[in-house]
Regions:
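Second-shell loop/turn segments in exported
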Residues: 72-83, 154-162, 188-195
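Catalytic Zn2+-binding segment of zinc metalloproteases
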Residues: 171-184
Length: 314
């Protein structure tokens, strides 16, 4: 009887082990993405605490981004094959996670991001954001969308992790993100091999780069001086959009009649033009002018393309 009970228990134990193994294999076969993409990251108790670092994910400037989704890079020849491969893996991870940002190799002269592997690879310009050893080096600080024009990454002090932790950390800085006070985050000031690219970072990048690049023309100011039947006027036009405004036309209107039009040509993003006209013939009864901007380039908002200016009498 004792032998029979022992055999029954042995059979039950074998069945439990068999089912357990089958269940584990089932999970591995059918849920590989979930096991990899949503792995739990344990806090790193050995990382030093930080001060004056926000608990919230933020950009150096609100809405800071490149004005294009196909971002180019150049890896300096001084970088080893391992350093190049780890950087390429970092680009691939961000590209796969966002599903919208792509990275392509380019010449050193034309690249959006320069990657070096020594402290002397590239000198940082003045008044730029270099967080750690990577970040934007040229920013056009427009009101609506501050634009990253250039970025740099230095990889001379890599952490020996299986994943490209250092490369991802610096790349996220180049994309405009500040440090965050979360030891589990790839953007924490101190690195550990267990850190991950946060879903909040990915969602912010998706939201920013899903916005179609457009121009954004508006009048900074305008003035008009009338003497008799003539007017001298000056207008200051800005483009705060993500792309250049092509074939910009300034129309001058009074009492629903177009008095004249002027070709302002192209206005680059983050740039502006001051345009002045002397001795424009106007009806004597006219006491104001309406200025209207038109362009063939799509804009975020056309409501601010019209401005009315009352005359200053001489």
């Amino acid at each position: 009887m004792g032998l029979l009970r022992w055999l029954v228990n042995l059979i039950l134990l074998a069945l439990i082990l068999l089912l357990g193994i089958f269940g584990f294999k089932f999970m591995c076969i059918y849920y590989p993405e979930k096991m990899q993409a949503f792995s739990i990251v344990n806090p790193s108790p050995n990382l030093p605490p930080v001060e004056n670092v926000s608990n919230e994910f933020s950009l150096f400037y609100p809405n800071l981004r490149f004005n294009h989704k196909d971002i180019t890079f150049f890896i300096n020849e001084e970088c080893s094959s391992q350093q190049k491969n780890r950087m390429l893996e970092g680009f691939l991870i961000v590209s796969n996670y966002t599903e919208i940002i792509k990275f392509y190799p380019s010449s050193e002269e034309n690249a959006d991001i320069l990657i070096g592997c020594s402290k002397n690879s590239y000198e940082a310009e003045e008044s730029v954001f270099i967080a750690g050893e990577g970040g934007p080096t040229k920013i056009i600080n427009s009101t609506y969308f501050p634009i990253i024009e250039k970025g740099k990454i230095l990889l001379y002090n890599q952490k020996t992790c299986e994943k490209p932790i250092t490369e991802l950390h610096e790349l996220i800085h180049v994309l405009g993100f500040e440090h965050v006070n979360n030891t589990q985050s790839i953007i924490y000031p101190y690195l550990s091999c267990e850190q991950e690219v946060d879903s909040k970072i990915i969602n912010m990048l998706k939201e920013l780069y899903s916005i179609e690049p457009k121009a954004e023309l508006y009048f900074l100011n305008a003035s008009a001086l009338k003497f008799g039947k003539y007017v001298n006027f000056s207008v200051n036009v800005r483009n705060e959009g993500l792309i250049s405004a092509q074939n910009v036309i300034l129309k001058v209107i009074s009492e629903n009649i177009q008095l004249d039009s002027f070709d302002l040509k192209e206005i680059d993003f983050g740039a502006g033009k001051t345009f002045e006209v002397s001795y424009l013939n106007v009806p004597s009864r006219t006491d104001s002018l309406i200025f209207k901007l038109e362009t063939e380039t799509p804009e975020f908002d056309k409501d601010n393309n019209i401005l009315s200016s009352n005359f200053q009498e001489v």
